[in-house]
Every structure is written in structure tokens, then in C-alpha cells.
Amino acid sequence: MKNYHDIVLALAGVCQSAKLVHQLATESRADSETFLTALNSLFITQPQRIEDVFGGEVRHLKLGLETLIHQLNAQGDQNLTRYWLSLLALEGKLSKNSDAKQTLGNRISRLKEQEIHYARDSETMLSIMANIYSDIISPLGKKIHILGSPDYLRQELVQNKIRAVLLAGIRSAVLWKQMGGTKWQILFFRRKLLATAKQIYSSIY
């Protein structure tokens, strides 16, 4: 039997990354706590439970749950829809590429070693995360076309933040697949996903 609670949390993680990308592209900034939650998820590779990936508490996925609920209600921004569905598609490509998976695992291990020297949200770490996305994930499939302010999208720091958040989105997409998530559920069990997302969201104080 599918654990829709965990599937929805992982999918909310994907949607949260999509929302952060939109914020960065249109405003050059993102909610700081939610941004850190996304970055931190890259460092939690052996969680005891799914909540551990997102700071140990469901409240850290509030923005993602809000976004997911709007998306499942067909009320969401079309660009957001494109972002999170593209992340799921890239995860599908990654799951079939053993070389890319191994390289990604090695690069994430090296990323974790850099914590000794740099804060996770430092420009150096963001650059490393962005390079991991550009080197390994981006070549796997169709590039995600980000829409926003040209002035912001030209800034290297904003570019690195967006790619780092996209990498976190891939982390959540991998988790979604591990929890039993499938695209068929999004098509045929949308009401179940929506009801579960609303139930989880209502538990956040």
C-alpha cells in the first residue's frame, strides 16, 4: 500500500524548489528559512524518516505544500507547473543513468566535506552546488527555461542560487520516487494527493 503522506511530502519538496526558483528569478530573493531548508536537504543522505530531509518538521515544507495544493487544484502558475514537472522528468533521466548517479553521489560527498570550511549558504558553496547541477543534471535532458527579470537572471549569484535550488529539487524528486511516487498518481490519483496535502497542511501551526 502506498504511503501517500511521504509521497506528498517529497512532492511538496519538489514544488517548494520550483517556487523558490520563481521567487529568485522574479525578485532576486527568496524566503531565507525555506531557501536554507532546500540547501540543507542536499546534506541529509541517510534520513531515518522523510521529515529529516526537510529539517525534521513538516512546517519547513509549508511553502511547498501551499504550492502543491494550488497546482493540484489547477490554480497554479504555469511556469511553476513547468518547473516541477521538468524536475520530475530530469529525475527520470537520472534514475536510468548509472554513471550520472554515481558521479552525483561522489560530488555530493565532496560537497559535504566542504562544510568544514564554508557555510552551506555561502557564495562558495552555492557555486559548488550550481556546478553539480550544471555538470550532471542539466545535460540529462531538456534544459529548464527559467522566466523572470533579465536584470536578476544575469547576476551570477542569482544564477547559482537557482541552480542550487534546482539541485535540491532533484533531491526531492529522487526521494519522491523512493517513496513510491509515480506520474500516474498525479494523473489518476490527484484527489488523493490533494486531500493528503491539505490534511498535512492543516496540521502546521
UniProtKB/Swiss-Prot annotation:
User: What membrane topology is given?
Assistant: Peripheral membrane protein
Which PANTHER family does the record cross-reference, listed alphabetically? HIGH FREQUENCY LYSOGENIZATION PROTEIN HFLD (PTHR38100:SF1)
Q: What is this protein called?
A: High frequency lysogenization protein HflD homolog
Keyword Membrane among UniProt keywords: yes
Question: Do you know which InterPro entries this protein is assigned to?
Answer: HflD, HflD-like_sf
**Which keywords accompany this UniProt record?**
Cell inner membrane, Cell membrane, Cytoplasm, Membrane
- What is one term from the GO cellular component aspect held by the record? cytoplasm
Give me the gene this protein comes from. hflD
Q: Which domain of life is it from?
A: Bacteria
Where in the cell does this protein reside? Cytoplasm; Cell inner membrane
Concerning its family, UniProt says:
Belongs to the HflD family.
Q: Which NCBIfam families match?
A: PRK00218.1-2 (NF001246), PRK00218.1-4 (NF001248)
| Predominant subcellular localization, coarse grouping | cytoplasm
